[in-house]
Amino acid sequence: MAQQDTDQQHTGVLPVDDDGFVIDAEDCEEREAAYRERGTSRPITVVGNPVLHKECKDVTDFGAELEQLVADMFASQRTAEGVGLAANQIGVDLKVFVYDCQDDEGTRHVGVVCNPKLVDLPADRRRLDDSNEGCLSVPTAYAPLARPDYAEVTGQDEKGNPIKVRGTGYFARCLQHETDHLYGYLYIDRLSKRERKDALRQMAENEPRYPVVAND
């Protein structure tokens, strides 16, 4: 795997492999801690909060405010024991998500994506996996949901540089799930009416294990 040439590197930017995808599986513990330790954990918004049900605004300012938001998101994700978190899940109307997730080989990936877009893959690369899926914004509820077991996302890093991220297995599910969030979709929106009702019942019958924002 080749890193970017020195003159193409920017402070805090991940190197890329020969196919142009970020190398997000190196120094994960150190990078996650560096983000998280600068941040403040915030409560999680839950289904019914308007910020979760509309498309978020594009990130256009890649300065100190975004840097602090990303740090807060990593701190919030750790508190909630999640593997991915979108900005609207802590009440911020911006297209950015963070992740700390393993792929189907158990390899850990850590990173940030702003203004993400899922790449439309050809049919022969869309093998579906119908594993259980959950969401911090639908606490304690799980349901099987078929999604492709490979995903590619394009976007920008927290410095505004173009990036490409790819994942397999659970990490592929995470990339799709978090991108959905930023366009106003929860995973339960992709379920049948019966399955959605059951997920909401699970949520109503159990207490979340992390702080949440109460809906009015």
Curated annotation (Swiss-Prot):
Catalytic activity field: N-terminal N-formyl-L-methionyl-[peptide] + H2O = N-terminal L-methionyl-[peptide] + formate
Gene3D superfamilies according to UniProt: Peptide deformylase
Cofactor note: Binds 1 Fe(2+) ion.
Active site feature: 178
Binding site for Fe cation: 135, 177, 181
Domain of life: Bacteria
Pfam families referenced in this protein's UniProt entry, alphabetically: Pep_deformylase
Requisite cofactors: Fe(2+)
GO terms of molecular function: metal ion binding; peptide deformylase activity
GO terms under biological process: co-translational protein modification; translation
InterPro entries reported in the protein's UniProt record: Peptide_deformylase, Peptide_deformylase_sf
Family membership noted in the UniProt record: Belongs to the polypeptide deformylase family.
The name this protein goes by in its record: Peptide deformylase 1
Species, as recorded: Streptomyces avermitilis (strain ATCC 31267 / DSM 46492 / JCM 5070 / NBRC 14893 / NCIMB 12804 / NRRL 8165 / MA-4680)
Gene for this chain: def1
